Amino acid sequence: MADGVFQGAIGIDLGTTYSCVATYESSVEIIANEQGNRVTPSFVAFTPEERLIGDAAKNQAALNPKNTVFDAKRLIGRRFDEESVQNDMKTWPFKVVDVEGAPVIEVEYLGETKQFSPQEISSMVLTKMKEIAEAKIGKKVEKAVITVPAYFNDAQRQATKDAGAISGLNVLRIINEPTAAAIAYGLGAGKSDKERHVLIFDLGGGTFDVSLLHIAGGVYTVKSTSGNTHLGGQDFDTNLLEHFKSDFKKKTGLDISNDARALRRLRTAAERAKRTLSSVTQTTVEVDSLFDGEDFEASLTRARFEDLNAALFKSTLEPVEQVLKDAKISKSQIDEVVLVGGSTRIPKVQKLLSDFFDGKQLEKSINPDEAVAYGAAVQGAILTGQSTSDETKDLLLLDVAPLSLGVGMQGDIFGVVVPRNTTVPTIKRRTFTTVGDNQTTVQFPVYQGERVNCKENTLLGEFDLKNIPPMQAGEPVLEAIFEVDANGILKVTAVEKSTGKSANITISNAVGRLSSEDIEKMVNQAEEFKAADEAFAKRHEAKQRLESYVASIEQTVTDPVLSSKLKRGSKTKIEAALADALAALQIEDGSTEEYRKAEVGLKRVVTKAMSSR
């Protein structure tokens, strides 16, 4: 890598199934990885020798299903006992265990059993995206803007920020995916300055968001947002997989439910069929020797695929109705409906949406896979003062809190302090009091959600306000102050007004939340893994170099014309040195140094022999 540090910040779309990275240097560029792909699978694989990230990890998933991790975004910031986690675990080939209420992934790596938090797995993908950018820019990248689903809660946002820290990035801002896509759309060619209401429909591999924005000049104001952090292409694949599984069982009497390799191969075939059906109306699915020597073959029509996923497709319209209702805007007032996310290529999804908007033409001018990273890179340039163009220098983003924030009151009633769709950053206050006479401590449990009963919302954390002067119940005035920053992350303070006593928390004691010590430890571990990866690559390279040199010398020695020019003694010496080099290649865990020494030794003998011909 060239010297120096990149002054700007890269934009990373950290996706459930694929990730994408962009940079801004006078204009936005989506950066391709070493395979030439502009999106990289969010996969990490562990083997007895090495760690693989991206395409290399996904390509070997069928051979190593138990140690190939994906869908980390469906675990990040969640509790182990959450229903979605429990359901997903039934479909994942890798093992997820409960560590103090948080889900942790367990794999075999370098011959040992290792545990990784979802933040660590995500950090490995982020590191890969950072390296892809560095290879293109030729400088070290230190700063990034990372995107999350608009509907991510506080815990999921903080955990994503932590993943960035573990990967060694300074995360300048966490921004919402649909908002980032709106920037890409708003800066697109031929867009006028006229005011417009734009609905962003973002259906990706694992998450779904709908955001309604008002765009005027360079000001992007999010009016409302809704979604489902557990709906996307993976779910359509799962429904297809179940259909194919029962089809195979019907035809052969064989059940592949417990065979991780067969399931991975069939899922890959299902994903391919789904993609194909976006452009044709019928396809054939074939998997040779799927299980017990039996081949799998089935034809699938687009209509059948739509039928299998009808309920899920239909459910995408609920958040659309919700954002219109929350923003108090009728559907006829929406100027553009913009499609984002790979799953919006599905014709049925497009038809349902177009029909909902009375046959409206959908806006497909932006690349659904790249728009989010594009917008993040623009925001990165603005935050680092690198945006030079007229259209970006006045750009202002006003986003919202996706879910209401508040405290638990007596009887488990949820007292809302920050209503959902409040523009952030924001500070909101609400006063509370005591429920018992002479009560000197009040506990403040902080929740996020929309239900009246606290138990049905997400508990973000709790803290105590102590040393309240003893008074009659209802007399003390306790003020809760909620501060939400531009990342959508919350800090809460409570103050007793007569004494000024206060207690505060940046929500950090929730299950699975990493302390700064945890993050530091993981950063060091990440460095160790990187060093191990590099050492493995060097060893592999040294071994390959030795192998190819040995092969070329063997060719020389066995070639009658070339070998006849060698003196008898020289030929014997070369053959002896070759035998030593081959012995070095046979060593099970040969080191880089051993391979290098063997290569140098062989070269020395060969050079001497050749020069004395």
UniProtKB/Swiss-Prot annotation:
<keyword id="KW-0067">ATP-binding</keyword>
<dbReference type="InterPro" id="IPR029047">
    <property type="entry name" value="HSP70_peptide-bd_sf"/>
</dbReference>
<keyword id="KW-0963">Cytoplasm</keyword>
<feature type="region of interest" description="Inter-domain linker">
    <location>
        <begin position="392"/>
        <end position="402"/>
    </location>
</feature>
<feature type="binding site">
    <location>
        <begin position="271"/>
        <end position="278"/>
    </location>
    <ligand>
        <name>ATP</name>
    </ligand>
</feature>
<dbReference type="InterPro" id="IPR029048">
    <property type="entry name" value="HSP70_C_sf"/>
</dbReference>
<feature type="binding site">
    <location>
        <position position="73"/>
    </location>
    <ligand>
        <name>ATP</name>
    </ligand>
</feature>
<feature type="region of interest" description="Nucleotide binding domain (NBD)">
    <location>
        <begin position="1"/>
        <end position="391"/>
    </location>
</feature>
<dbReference type="GO" id="GO:0006412">
    <property type="term" value="P:translation"/>
</dbReference>
<protein>
    <recommendedName>
        <fullName>Ribosome-associated molecular chaperone SSB1</fullName>
        <ecNumber>3.6.4.10</ecNumber>
    </recommendedName>
</protein>
<keyword id="KW-0378">Hydrolase</keyword>
<feature type="short sequence motif" description="Nuclear export signal">
    <location>
        <begin position="574"/>
        <end position="582"/>
    </location>
</feature>
<feature type="region of interest" description="Lid domain (SBDalpha)">
    <location>
        <begin position="516"/>
        <end position="612"/>
    </location>
</feature>
<dbReference type="InterPro" id="IPR043129">
    <property type="entry name" value="ATPase_NBD"/>
</dbReference>
<keyword id="KW-0143">Chaperone</keyword>
<feature type="binding site">
    <location>
        <begin position="205"/>
        <end position="207"/>
    </location>
    <ligand>
        <name>ATP</name>
    </ligand>
</feature>
<dbReference type="Pfam" id="PF00012">
    <property type="entry name" value="HSP70"/>
</dbReference>
<dbReference type="GO" id="GO:0005737">
    <property type="term" value="C:cytoplasm"/>
</dbReference>
<keyword id="KW-0648">Protein biosynthesis</keyword>
<feature type="binding site">
    <location>
        <begin position="16"/>
        <end position="18"/>
    </location>
    <ligand>
        <name>ATP</name>
    </ligand>
</feature>
<comment type="similarity">
    <text>Belongs to the heat shock protein 70 family. Ssb-type Hsp70 subfamily.</text>
</comment>
<dbReference type="InterPro" id="IPR013126">
    <property type="entry name" value="Hsp_70_fam"/>
</dbReference>
<dbReference type="GO" id="GO:0140662">
    <property type="term" value="F:ATP-dependent protein folding chaperone"/>
</dbReference>
<dbReference type="InterPro" id="IPR018181">
    <property type="entry name" value="Heat_shock_70_CS"/>
</dbReference>
<comment type="subunit">
    <text>Binds to ribosomes. Binds close to the ribosomal tunnel exit via contacts with both ribosomal proteins and rRNA. Directly interacts with nascent polypeptides. This interaction is dependent on the ribosome-associated complex (RAC). Interacts with SSE1. Interacts with FES1.</text>
</comment>
<dbReference type="GO" id="GO:0016887">
    <property type="term" value="F:ATP hydrolysis activity"/>
</dbReference>
<feature type="binding site">
    <location>
        <position position="342"/>
    </location>
    <ligand>
        <name>ATP</name>
    </ligand>
</feature>
<dbReference type="GO" id="GO:0005524">
    <property type="term" value="F:ATP binding"/>
</dbReference>
<feature type="region of interest" description="Substrate binding domain (SBD)">
    <location>
        <begin position="403"/>
        <end position="613"/>
    </location>
</feature>
<comment type="function">
    <text>Ribosome-bound, Hsp70-type chaperone that assists in the cotranslational folding of newly synthesized proteins in the cytosol. Stimulates folding by interacting with nascent chains, binding to short, largely hydrophobic sequences exposed by unfolded proteins, thereby stabilizing longer, more slowly translated, and aggregation-prone nascent polypeptides and domains that cannot fold stably until fully synthesized. The Hsp70-protein substrate interaction depends on ATP-binding and on allosteric regulation between the NBD and the SBD.</text>
</comment>
<keyword id="KW-0547">Nucleotide-binding</keyword>
